[in-house]
Amino acid sequence: MNLKRMIIALACSALLLVPFTSISTHAQEIDIHQQSIPSKLPVIGDPLPKVNQDKVTTPLHPFSPSNIKNSNSFFHTLAATRTVTILIAADEEYRAAHPDWKSLTKQLVEKAGQSFLTEHNIQFSVVNYTTWKSDGYDSASILYDLNTEWGNTSSYDFVIGFTKDTRFTAGGIAYMYPSAPPSGISVIFDLGTLYTPYAIQHEISHNYGLPHDASGSGIKCMMNYDYAYSVKYWDASHDALLESHRNWYGY
């Protein structure tokens, strides 16, 4: 990735560890200062409470189609299917926690991809796996680690890193690009089988250039932190933006 030619905003889901009882509860707002990672690219800090990892492993059944479709969306009826390729990367902590990490992460990604397929005919295809070492001191610098290794590749549309590094204090973090990059880069924390697919769909949406909805706005959308762990679709404005960017990736 040529950093001199591209201004990249980092949209980070700083899902801080706080007591969590209901996914419908409005996110607690915490003010933090803008910070920077080694690349000197700006990090937009917009925190969201991190849900505690589900104690019981939730079966990875598909999302119910009735819970994905937004009645205000019509894009799924118009667009031809577009397939995007995905490389899954797992760091040392994630691999240690999940010996079956390849099959697990594939299922998590495919579940997250249902919303993209149902609403926008974007088909997620996991085509390869790799390992990586998360050396960063916080969430943003760990994302930078992954980007350093894979940000310039054009072999995959998306590179999704999975981490269980204790220095990663977010539930997910991703680069939000102003135009099509060589590859979309994101890192997802291990939130368990229940909540991880929500984090993936949120961060991949950032890779497509989608910003957040304002907390407290009442807008039901996966890009609104108030509904990030309960909603599997986009609001009308994000639907339109995603549709306009769908050709950034895939074939």
Regions found by a protein language model. Name each.
Residues I30-Y156, T163-T166:
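Propeptide-to-catalytic entry region of secreted or membrane-anchored zinc metalloproteases
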Residues A97, W101-L108, I142, T196-I204, ...:
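Stable alpha-helical elements in mature extracytoplasmic
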Residues M1-L3:
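N-terminal secretory signal peptides that target proteins for export/translocation
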Residues L17-I32:
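Sec-dependent signal peptide cleavage junction
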Residues K232-S237:
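Short, solvent-exposed loop/beta-turn-alpha elements that line the ligand-binding surface or hinge
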Residues F74-A79, A89, L146-I219, N224-V231, ...:
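Active-site-proximal segment of zinc-dependent metalloprotease catalytic domains
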Residues R5-F20:
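Sec-dependent N-terminal signal peptides
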